[in-house]
Regions:
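Electrostatic, structured charged patches in enzyme active sites and in nucleic-acid/phosphate-binding
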Residues: 1-114
Length: 114
């Protein structure tokens, strides 16, 4: 019997062999690899991680864990750094995490793909 995640997403692999949290994310990874091969985008990174730091101090949870954001993809498109997240279900903490990311990383364009 297949085991589903919290939102019934099935872990899937893209053609490049990366494991993704959902089929939709794996399909988007294939599209981005095709765009990179065609020269439309460059410097594709899978699952980049960003840590939230304000005034040189790491933001931490009450238990001491660092607060950050792990997106699905990062790439350069027409000279612009794009951070992309494939969204199925919008989770409770996403609006806050999104706002913090935009404030701390203004040189990145954050895109949500449905």
């Amino acid at each position: 019997m297949k085991r589903f995640g919290k939102y019934r997403a099935v872990k899937s692999q893209c053609r490049a062999g990366h494991t993704h949290d959902s089929k939709r994310e794996a399909i988007r990874c294939n599209e981005l690899h095709d765009l990179q091969a065609a020269g439309a985008i460059s410097d594709l990174i899978i699952h980049p991680q960003y840590w939230f730091v304000i005034n040189g101090r790491q933001i931490k949870h009450s238990n001491g864990r660092r607060v950050g954001y792990k997106s699905d993809f990062e790439y350069v498109e027409k000279g612009i750094n794009v951070t992309e997240d494939v969204k199925g279900v919008v989770v409770r903490d996403w609006p806050l995490r999104r706002a913090i990311f935009i404030a701390l990383f203004p040189h990145h364009q954050l895109r949500e793909t449905k």
